[in-house]
């Protein structure tokens, strides 16, 4: 079988399609994040309405809100710590892969 060399226009089309695919992937992830965020807001309001009962004082409602806020702030802190740990592991793996690649290149020479 004979392979034909792609023309310049074919290469441009490939690059254009690849960029479009990546842009669509980023947009899909962005929309999915917005969906998750709004679903969380709906759940938060549902939870809040479960706690608030008729005849409660403003102070009691504010106490519930403050408690929920504290819980969410703690979760954010936990996620920040987890993200830092994952990033450190990713960097360590990248260093190992780079070292392995350099060892392989050294053997090939």
Curated annotation (Swiss-Prot):
One of its GO terms (biological process) is regulation of protein localization to cell tip. Its main location: cytoplasm. Disruption phenotype: Cells lacking this gene are hyperactive for PTS sugar consumption. In the absence of TmaR, PtsI is diffuse, released from the poles, and, therefore, more active in sugar uptake. The absence of the gene also leads to detrimental effects on the ability of cells to survive in mild acidic conditions, probably due to PtsI hyperactivity. Absence of the gene severely impairs the capacity of E.coli to produce flagella. The mutant shows a reduced swimming ability, is completely impaired in swarming on semi-solid agar and has a dramatically reduced ability to form biofilms. InterPro entries: DUF496, UPF0265. The keyword Plastid does not apply. Phosphorylated on Tyr-72. Phosphorylation on Tyr-72 is important for activity and polar localization of PtsI. Phosphorylation on Tyr-79 might be required for polar localization of Hfq. It is found in: Cytoplasm. Changing residue 91 to S: Fails to form clusters and presents a diffused pattern throughout the cytoplasm. Changing residue 48 to P: Fails to form clusters and presents a diffused pattern throughout the cytoplasm. Shows a reduced swimming ability, is completely impaired in swarming on semi-solid agar and has a dramatically reduced ability to form biofilms. Changing residue 72 to D/E: Does not localize to the cell poles. The modification Phosphotyrosine is found at residues 72, 79. The keyword Transport does not apply. Changing residue 72 to F: Does not localize to the cell poles and is completely spread within the cytoplasm. Has no effect on survival in acidic conditions. Does not form foci. When overexpressed, forms polar aggregates and does not form chained cells. Keywords: Coiled coil, Cytoplasm, Phosphoprotein, Stress response. GO terms for cellular component: cell tip; cytosol. Regulated via phosphorylation. Phosphorylation of TmaR on Tyr-72 is required for the release of PtsI from the poles and for its activity. Only phosphorylated TmaR can release PtsI from the poles, since the diffuse non-phosphorylated TmaR binds to PtsI quite irreversibly. Transmembrane segments: none annotated. Residues 14-41 form a coiled coil. Overexpression of TmaR leads to the formation of chained cells, suggesting that the cells cannot complete division. Overexpressed TmaR forms filaments. The two helices, which seemingly fold into a coiled-coil, and the C-terminal region are probably all necessary for TmaR condensation. Interacts directly with the PTS EI component PtsI. Binding is reversible as long as TmaR can get phosphorylated. HAMAP family: Pole_loc_TmaR (MF_00683). Pole-localizer protein involved in the regulation of several cellular processes. Regulated processes include sugar metabolism, cell motility and small RNA-mediated regulation. TmaR controls the subcellular localization and the activity of PtsI, the general PTS system enzyme I (EI), by polar sequestration and release of PtsI. Polar sequestration of PtsI restricts its activity, thus regulating sugar metabolism and enabling cell survival in mild acidic conditions. TmaR does not affect localization of the phosphocarrier protein HPr. It also plays a central role in cell motility. This is Pole-localizer protein TmaR. It comes from Escherichia coli (strain K12).
